[in-house]
Amino acid sequence: MNEILKKRLKLLKNNFGTHINKIANKKILITGANGYIGSILTLILHGNAKLYCLVRNKDKMIDRFQEICGDIDKIDIYEDLYKIQDKIDIVIHCAAPTQSDFFIENPIDTVDIIYTNTKNILDFSKKNNVEKIIFLSTMEIYGDVIGDNIVEDDIGKFSVTNIRNSYPLAKQISEFMVHSYSKKYSLSTAIVRLTQAIGPTAQINDNRVYMDFIRSAIKKSQITLFTKGETKREYIDVFDVATAIIFVMCEKKMFEIYNISNPNIFISIYDLAKTISAKLNVQVVFDLQRDTSQYLPSFSRRLNSKKIYQLGWTPLFDLNQSLDDMIKYIKEVNE
C-alpha cells in the first residue's frame, strides 16, 4: 500500500477507531466502489466489515483497488445488484456520474442513471430489510441559494432550460425518493450533501477543477484559468468525507440530512489555483475567450455543517495537507 495512505489509515483509526469498530462484521454494500469516495470507503472498511462492491466494470475495480490497497481479499465485487444473495446490513449509495461534460452532453442519461439506480437501490433495500441506507448527494441541490450559513432546510430554484442542471435536479428527485421510501416503508435512511472533495487517490484523468490545475501544472508547466475564478466554496478531504459517512452509519435515526464540509477550507477557484501553482512552482495565466457554458455561474456558498459536528465528527486534514498528499500521490502512481 502507498505510504501516504498507510499514514492516513493509521491516523483515522487512532482518532475514529471506536466508530469504525461499531460497524465491524457488518455486511456493507458500497455502490460506485471504484469511484473517488467509494474507493476510500472500501479502503477504510476493508478488513473491518464484510464488503460488497457494486461497480459497472469488475476489472476496473480490481485494478483501482490493487493500486490503492494491493489486497482485494474479503471483498465481493458485483456488476449486477440482483446477484447479491447475502443479507446486507448497510448500503452506501455512492454511484453516479460526476463529470460536468457528461451532464451537458447527456442530460437525459444523467437524470435516468441517477434516478433509476437510486430507485433500484431503495427497492433492493426494502426487499432485504436493510438496516441503514446512506445516499450521497451534493451541495449543488441548493440551486441559487448562496451565503455563509446554508442549512439542510434551505431550498433553491433551478432553470429547467439549463442543461447543466440535469445533475442537481436528478440528485434532488433522488433525495425525495430516499425520504419517501423512509416514510412509507420505515427504512432508516440518511442523505449526506457533500461539498467538493479533495485529497489523494483522485485519478489523473478526473475533470474536477483542482485536478485540471494539477494536471496542467505537471504537464504544461502552467495553470490556465478560463474564468476569473471568483466562485468561492468549501472543500473537504476525501478521507474526512469517508469518516463523516461512517459517523452517519452509526446513527440510529430513521431519517436525517447532513451537510458535509470543512469550514476551515473556504477558498475561491483563483486562490486555489494560486495555492497549487506555488506548490508546483508554476504560473497562473488566464484565457477568458473560451466558451464557459459548461461551468456553473460564479457563486459564494458556505454550508452549515453543525449537524455532523454534533455527532462528534471533526475533519483531520487541512488544505495544505490535502493538496500535498494529492500531488505526491499523483506523481508516485503515474511515474
From Swiss-Prot:
Pathway: Capsule biogenesis; capsule polysaccharide biosynthesis. GO terms for molecular function: nucleotide binding; oxidoreductase activity. NADP(+) binds at residues 34, 36-37, 56, 60, 94, 96, 98, 167, 171, 197. Signal peptide: none annotated. Keywords: Capsule biogenesis/degradation, NADP, Nucleotide-binding, Oxidoreductase. It catalyses: CDP-6-D-glucitol + NADP(+) = CDP-6-keto-D-fructose + NADPH + H(+). CDP-6-D-glucitol binds at residues 100, 140, 164, 195-196, 208-209, 212, 224, 226-227, 233, 296. It comes from the Bacteria. Coiled coil: none annotated. InterPro entries: Epimerase_deHydtase (IPR001509), NAD(P)-bd_dom_sf (IPR036291). Pfam families: Epimerase (PF01370). Its EC number is 1.1.1.-. CDP binds at residues 100, 164, 212, 224, 226-227, 233, 296. Belongs to the NAD(P)-dependent epimerase/dehydratase family. NADP-dependent oxidoreductase involved in the biosynthesis of capsular polysaccharides. Catalyzes the reduction of CDP-6-D-fructose with NADPH to generate CDP-6-D-glucitol. This is CDP-6-D-glucitol synthase. It comes from Campylobacter jejuni.
